[in-house]
Amino acid sequence: MFTDAIVRGLDGDDPSTPSANANQPNDTVHTIAVFGHRPPELGGYGENSTTMSVRRRLIELLRAKLEMHPDLQVITGLGLGVELLAAEAAAAAAVPYVVVLAFEGMEQRWPEATQRRFSELLAGARSVITANAEVPKTSSQFARAMGRRDDTIMTYTTEAVLVRHADDRTLGDLQRKLERNLEEDVWVMNPE
């Protein structure tokens, strides 16, 4: 099982340099957090035109941001949906990414193919941070663990991308929190 900050997947990363160690706050790295919908709001759990479009647009955005910020990195929770797409887009755009897990083993209830995809993306991360030491046992503990994970992500974030339908209410609180913390550096992308 992977533990905090031991997985480094990019050639040339030097753990002693600040940009390669996401466990230390670092003002010199431009970090984009990516949040968004889970699979049901993206057309389902399999690959489809919506997930392909979101991934493609994230790749284009990251390539453009990389030209503006050569020290760019992505930070993601690697949850189902947009967060997995964000890691895939970062890898495709040759942008390093950091993973903040809500807790160890969060993928264990997922289908086997998705667990393999998760493991591959986790292995490719610049570093991995685990926000909660304990695995939640109840739905309220799970919600708190996810909230702590989001708060951990935000401590490293320079700007954010939120993939959501404009009329969706589930991500409204997160959008307001991001806008409060990052002001105008929050980009909302419609998944369609």
Task: Indicate where each model-derived feature is located.
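Acidic/glycine-enriched connector segments
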Residues: 4-192
